[in-house]
Amino acid sequence: MPASMKDRVAIVTGGTRGIGLATARSLLDRGATVCITGRSTEQLADALTQLDAGERAIGVAGHAAEAAHQDATVARVMAEFGSVDVLVNGVGINPYYGSTSDLPEDVAIKMFRTNVLAALAWFTRCEQAWMGEHGGSVVNLSSAGAYRGGPLLGSYGITKAAMIRLTEQLALEKAPRRIRVNAVAPGTVRTKFAAQFWEGNEEAAAAAYPLGRAGEPEDVAEAIAFLASDDASWITGQTLAIDGGLLLTTLVDSLA
């Protein structure tokens, strides 16, 4: 039986759909109280309706990369629940598909700010509010693209590789404070974010994976919940590939 997360409070950024929403549900199923974030109040309301967890789930609207939203979210969680035991950095963007050498500087800055620096900022606030004194668990969302480049996706992969290195560094620095920091690196998951890689071409997408299918949000969510829980109490600084075996293949094989 999975370890109970009763009396644990989690923040899941980007928690209104896809992997983030599935993660919130998995944490709730283990007994945690969860705060999800998202940019749209309508999407937050819909997500909370789907979660159907009553007072154990709240939502805060705002831009995940903005300091004011980070401050307001952590302050509300502390005021309502008294702790921040788990942080899941689930927000990521990929607004550019093309050659990395042609990546506009302003887009590069936006990607790095949202995909990497925001994760650090959220961590810092959670550490200052609670984790620095009481310990905690952080799970960052990276990508299989961090390990292997592909056409048009190199820039996104670079930010996700940085996320892995950030995970390792924070894990090393914060272990004495009993803060565990890990990451997950999914392959193609059937979400709106990754729709262009599977929607309308599911057979080809599945063929790229030795296990014969693209991932589901729940595949990733359950791994995140495991890493966040006491089941992973002696695991830190690790990145778990959840990719249906994709990284076992070569780039040539996956594109054949």
Q: What is each residue range found by the language model?
A:
Residues 16-18:
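Conserved glycine-rich cofactor-binding loop
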Residues 71, 94-109, 132, 152-155, ...:
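Conserved mid-core segment of classical short-chain dehydrogenase/reductases
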Residues 94-97, 225, 236-256:
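Short C-terminal tail/terminal secondary-structure segment
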Residues 101-120, 139, 163, 211:
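Catalytic Tyr-X3-Lys loop
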Residues 123, 159, 167:
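Active-site helix of classical SDR
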Residues 128, 172-173, 233:
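Alpha-helical segment proximal to the catalytic Tyr-Lys
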